[in-house]
Curated annotation (Swiss-Prot):
Keyword line: Antioxidant, Disulfide bond, Oxidoreductase, Peroxidase, Redox-active center
Quaternary data: Homodimer; disulfide-linked, upon oxidation.
Residues making up the signal peptide according to the UniProt record: none
Described purpose of this protein according to its UniProt entry: Thiol-specific peroxidase that catalyzes the reduction of hydrogen peroxide and organic hydroperoxides to water and alcohols, respectively. Plays a role in cell protection against oxidative stress by detoxifying peroxides and as sensor of hydrogen peroxide-mediated signaling events.
Enzyme class at the top of the EC tree: oxidoreductase
Misc. remarks from the entry: The active site is a conserved redox-active cysteine residue, the peroxidatic cysteine (C(P)), which makes the nucleophilic attack on the peroxide substrate. The peroxide oxidizes the C(P)-SH to cysteine sulfenic acid (C(P)-SOH), which then reacts with another cysteine residue, the resolving cysteine (C(R)), to form a disulfide bridge. The disulfide is subsequently reduced by an appropriate electron donor to complete the catalytic cycle. In this typical 2-Cys peroxiredoxin, C(R) is provided by the other dimeric subunit to form an intersubunit disulfide.
Residue intervals of the Thioredoxin domain: 4-162
Reactions accelerated catalytically: a hydroperoxide + [thioredoxin]-dithiol = an alcohol + [thioredoxin]-disulfide + H2O
EC assignment: 1.11.1.24
Gene3D superfamilies: Glutaredoxin
GO biological process: cell redox homeostasis; hydrogen peroxide catabolic process; removal of superoxide radicals; response to oxidative stress
Record-given protein name: Peroxiredoxin
Amino acid sequence: MSKAMIGKPAPEFTATAVVDGDFKSISLSDYKGKYVVLFFYPMDFTFVCPTEIIAFSEHVGEFKKLGVEVLAASTDSQFSHLAWINTPRKQGGLGEMKIPIISDNNHQISRDYGVLKEDDGIAYRGLFIIDPKGILRQITVNDLPVGRSVTETLRLVQAFQFVDKHGEVCPAGWTPGADTIKPGVKESKAYFEKH
């Protein structure tokens, strides 16, 4: 059963990851005080997965400007991750990575986050936004054939950061600089009168 619930502490983990071409033990608690985007993908050496991982890695600078750490995870071993990173992109590999890739080869992290496809031993495409206090703020899970949007993930992080800082809420499709809503029956009318 999933331990991952919105508004509750994100399940803690410690695992081996490939970081800057080397093996390193990392824990979720290492990132306390920062927003974290944790995303799971099904398998190394597949087809949709490299498009997502490369996209998140190439946009990591935008996340870092927002104080956000990005972590990828699958049930493959750290050795498989490293081999995939060392495979050129033109051959379906990842090439240089700017984000840690976690090995969940005992499936515990995927199980705790509710994304383990038990019959195949792989993770669904789960994406989790965790705030600086370690609280889960957002969960999405895609079926295997459809990748996720880095742009939408950035937008969601920015929306949660705005809410945390200003106490106002963000309407559908909100982007930085757009109008927000003051929560309250009377206060919200100012937004609705404009829109």
